[in-house]
Amino acid sequence: MWFWFSLIALICWSGSDLFSKIGCQDADDKYSHLKMVMAVGLVMGLHAAYEIFINGTEINGSIILTYLPVSLLYISSMTIGYIGLRYIELSISSPICNSSGALVAVLALATGGLGELVPAQLAATALVCVGVIGLGIVEAREDNDLRAARQQASNHRYAKSALALILPVIYCLLDALGTFADSRVLEALNEDSANCAYELTFLLAGIVCFVYVVLIKKSRLVPKREGPKYAGAVCETAGQFAYIYALADTEHVALAAPIISAYCVASVLWSRIFLKEKLSWKHYAMIALVVAGIVILGVYDA
């Protein structure tokens, strides 16, 4: 079953990328990112309720507070990522956002973890860093006429913008810090309890966003626009569920991890098929470096 859970995680998380992009890309809705937080908060809250009341997962105020710094880092990173989806192609955003594993390796080095990393992991980290920096250079130097020409068939047009690259990078930094902190906090907490604490904190964030967006700012919730957000939220939560079960099969973790870590490849594919995004060969070359590094890190993470 590990293989099918791995595929489900890959499909769901790449689907979350796609639906989140569709739900957050409208520039005329300045609260779309907060509405996405509302959607994810609701779905995660429902899943937390299932885990607590049906599966009997232990949760209390102490656990929630202990895990709170990690939860806030993850939630902040996702919110920043949702904002960034307005300004840049998913084909570029997803590989950058999913490069956080390389930054975790860098953090491990900075805190004295050099002995725990093998040369292949260092090489993979270098590949990811070169690829992300290369994507930034390609984006910055691309001729405006060539950009307009390749975006001709796309559903949206994106102007050259420093913000477009900065936001996915901020997501990557915050997610890496969250993952690094996660590894420390989970030494004292049960993983299921920590996940419930995260989901309940996300639910609270969603409620706060609802109060601000709907009750204070009086922004309307249009079903046609909100639908993709909730589809993305379901995919995000289902992907997390499948991920846990895929890695629970300890005999096949070394095979499951790289399959799941390559979900940004599927995100690039979906963006090409459904969003009609088209990049230059230089973009794809840099993305290939990032993906190769992510997959190698996934193998050794197992």
Summary of predicted features, one role per range:
Residues L42-H47, I96-T111, L204-V208, G239-A242, ...:
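Alpha-helical transmembrane segments of compact multi-pass small-molecule transporters, enriched
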Residues V43-S62, A110-E116, I133-S154, R184, ...:
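Membrane-interface helix-cap regions at the ends of transmembrane helices
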Residues C97, G112-A148, I273-I296:
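Loop-to-transmembrane alpha-helix entry segments
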Residues G15-L42, T57, L174-L204:
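Juxtamembrane helix-loop-helix junctions in multi-pass membrane proteins
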Residues A27-S32, I80-I96, L114-G115, E187-N195, ...:
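Structural motif at transmembrane-helix junctions in multi-pass transporters
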Residues W2-A9, A39, A49-I80, A162-L173, ...:
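Loop-to-transmembrane-helix transition segments
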Residues M1-W13, N60-Y74, V118-V130, D192-A205, ...:
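Structural signature of hydrophobic alpha-helical transmembrane segments
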Residues S14, L18, A49, S71, ...:
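Hydrophobic/small/kink-forming positions within alpha-helical transmembrane segments
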